[in-house]
C-alpha cells in the first residue's frame, strides 16, 4: 500500500468489510465488489455494518474538518461538482440507501417507486460546519433505520440503482459504506494535493 492509501489501513481496522468490498473498485475488479458485498452482508450483520458506517462517517468528517475554507469550492472529484456538493451528496446517499433497505425490510416499500437517480449533488455552498453536521445526521438516520434491517439482511430490496442494480437489504447497508470510501478517496487525494502546494 502506498502512502496515498495510508488512511485505508487505519480505517480497515474499524470497517474491515466495507474496505474489503471497496478494494475491488480501487483495483479495477468491479465484479468482485458485488461478490464481497454479498459475502459480507448475511444474516446478523446489520448492526456490525452500522458500526462500520460510523467509522466511515467519522473518517469523512475528519477530512472535511481539516480542509481549508477555500477547498469547499474546489473540484470535488465527481464530474463538475465542488467539494461541498460531493460531501453533501455522500451524506444524502448514505442515509437514503439505508432508509430504502429499512423500508423494504419492514415491508413498507412504496408502490411505484422510481429507480434511483444517481449523481445528485449536495448544495454548492455547503460549509465545513454544515457538512460535518449533515454527515452526523446521516449516521443518526442510519442507526435508527438499520434496526428494521436486523434479521432481514437477506431480504430482497426493490431499490433499483442504474449503476448497481438490485441488492438485498443488508447489502445496501454495506454498499453505502463502499460509496463513502469512493468519495473519501477523492477527498484524501484533494487534501494531499493541497498539502503539496
Where are these regions (language model features)?
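Short, contiguous, helix-prone interaction/anchoring segments in small proteins
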Residues: 33-72
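Short helix/strand-capping connector loops at secondary-structure junctions
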Residues: 33-40, 121, 158-171
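Acidic/histidine-rich alpha-helical segments that form the ligand environment
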Residues: 52-65, 100, 116-156, 174
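Helix-loop segments that flank and shape redox-cofactor active sites
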Residues: 58-84, 106-112, 148-168, 194
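Short, hydrophobic, well-ordered secondary-structure elements
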Residues: 80-98, 184
Amino acid at each position: 500500500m502506498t502512502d496515498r492509501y495510508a488512511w485505508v489501513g487505519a480505517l480497515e481496522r474499524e470497517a474491515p468489510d466495507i474496505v474489503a468490498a471497496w478494494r475491488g473498485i480501487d483495483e479495477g475488479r468491479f465484479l468482485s465488489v458485488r461478490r464481497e458485498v454479498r459475502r459480507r452482508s448475511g444474516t446478523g450483520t446489520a448492526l456490525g455494518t452500522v458500526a462500520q458506517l460510523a467509522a466511515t462517517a467519522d473518517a469523512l468528517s475528519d477530512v472535511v474538518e481539516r480542509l481549508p475554507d477555500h477547498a469547499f469550492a474546489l473540484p470535488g472529484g465527481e464530474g463538475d461538482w465542488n467539494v461541498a456538493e460531493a460531501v453533501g451528496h455522500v451524506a444524502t446517499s448514505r442515509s437514503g440507501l439505508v432508509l430504502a433497505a429499512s423500508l423494504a425490510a419492514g415491508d413498507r416499500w412504496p408502490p411505484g417507486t422510481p429507480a434511483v437517480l444517481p449523481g445528485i449533488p449536495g448544495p454548492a455552498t455547503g460549509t465545513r460546519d454544515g457538512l460535518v453536521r449533515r454527515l452526523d445526521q446521516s449516521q443518526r438516520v442510519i442507526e435508527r433505520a438499520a434496526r428494521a434491517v436486523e434479521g432481514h439482511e437477506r431480504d430482497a430490496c426493490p431499490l433499483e440503482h442504474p449503476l448497481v442494480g438490485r441488492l438485498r437489504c443488508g447489502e445496501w447497508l454495506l454498499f453505502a459504506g463502499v460509496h463513502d470510501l469512493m468519495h473519501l478517496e477523492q477527498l484524501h487525494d484533494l487534501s494531499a494535493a493541497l498539502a503539496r502546494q
